[in-house]
Amino acid sequence: MSDMHQMSADEVIAHLDLELLEGEGCWYRLLWNNGSGNAIYGMVTPREFSALHVLAEDELWVHVAGDPVDLLILHPDGSHQQVRLGKGAGQTPSVLVPAGSWQGASVATGWGLFVCALAPAFTGFALATPEHDFTAWAQVSGRIKELIRG
């Protein structure tokens, strides 16, 4: 198949040689890492979503193909953003997640492929658990629960 948009999730995973990221849960493949920054392909499906996690680095998300990706960003000041990453009307093709902000993403149907670029380079992440205190973001508590594994 020459058009990635016509592929199934399994076909995209095989075509791009993606691996399941343990814990966080999305499909990924490292594209570039030079010590100053790095980039990955990431892909979510209804079953394999990006669980709520926090990074020490700024992360730029850019939609590449497939269905829109619903991204939740919880900022340290108690504010939040709900972003629909995609190419259609009412969607945004890219969004920056500032360092120290909790983030998680899912897709309602199909699959969504994106690139995430970090600067400085990735050093690790903390994964949310049901025991984490997210009361500062009570207005999106239902969405937070959807994005926590366990």
Regions found by a protein language model. Name each.
Residues 2-96, 104, 111-112, 120-124, ...:
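Non-catalytic, conserved peripheral segments adjacent to functional cores
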